[in-house]
Design a protein with these regions (language model features):
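Catalytic cores and adjacent binding grooves of peptidoglycan-active enzymes
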Residues: 86-165
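Amphipathic alpha-helical interface surfaces
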Residues: 38-42, 64, 80, 93, ...
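Extended, low-complexity, intrinsically disordered C-terminal regulatory tails
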Residues: 43-68
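Short, surface-exposed glycine/acidic/tryptophan-bearing loops
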Residues: 62-82
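Structural recognition of the beta-strand scaffold that forms the well-ordered cores
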Residues: 54-56, 81-85, 131
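Extracytoplasmic cell-surface/polysaccharide-interacting catalytic and binding patches
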Residues: 1-47, 148-165
């Protein structure tokens, strides 16, 4: 089922973990509508601007979220979030997603630059992936960096230099 010109329902619900563990990761009718809005309002404009985007994680059922050690309260479980990467000519360049999001002035709830070379004091120029979410109402336009502290715990902080990575 096509959700937008370049995104399908399968792409936003695919999970090797769910398949391997026999977990049902099928969205509800309401979920399909929300994923369609996510695809048309946020993902497709980004795709139009930067080219091919690789969705590495989209909708997660609460059971799948638990199986991978994530929160059942995650925006992924509410049909509002994807993790994605941008690869061009075999080279990952995920910061392009962030740059396009800001340049296009798209509405979004959260943009998290996940790990890569991020630290407590340094914004990543090479995040491993981008977590991006969109809600029907009350989007926060929150930009965060995820990094590991000295105890290998995941921490989040605001992006230090919002427009100048």
């Amino acid at each position: 089922m096509r959700l937008s010109k370049n995104f399908t329902l399968k792409e936003l619900t695919r999970s090797n973990t769910a398949t391997r563990l026999g977990i049902d990761n099928e969205p509800s009718k309401e979920g399909i509508l929300k994923l369609t809005l996510l695809a048309t309002e946020l993902l497709q404009p980004l795709r139009n601007a930067v080219g091919s985007l690789r969705i590495t994680s989209g909708y997660r059922s609460p059971q799948l979220s638990e199986a991978i050690g994530s929160s059942s309260n995650s925006q992924h479980c509410r049909y509002e979030a994807v993790d994605m990467q941008f690869v061009k000519r075999g080279k990952m360049d995920n910061i392009k997603i962030y740059d396009a999001l800001i340049d296009l002035d798209l509405d979004f709830d959260q943009c998290i630059l996940e790990f890569g070379n991020a630290t407590e004091h340094i914004d990543p120029t090479e995040p491993d992936w981008i977590h991006l979410s969109w809600k029907v109402v009350d989007n926060r336009r929150q930009t965060l960096v995820a990094y590991k502290d000295e105890n290998n715990k995941t921490k989040y902080r605001p992006i230090i230099n919002y427009n100048c990575i």
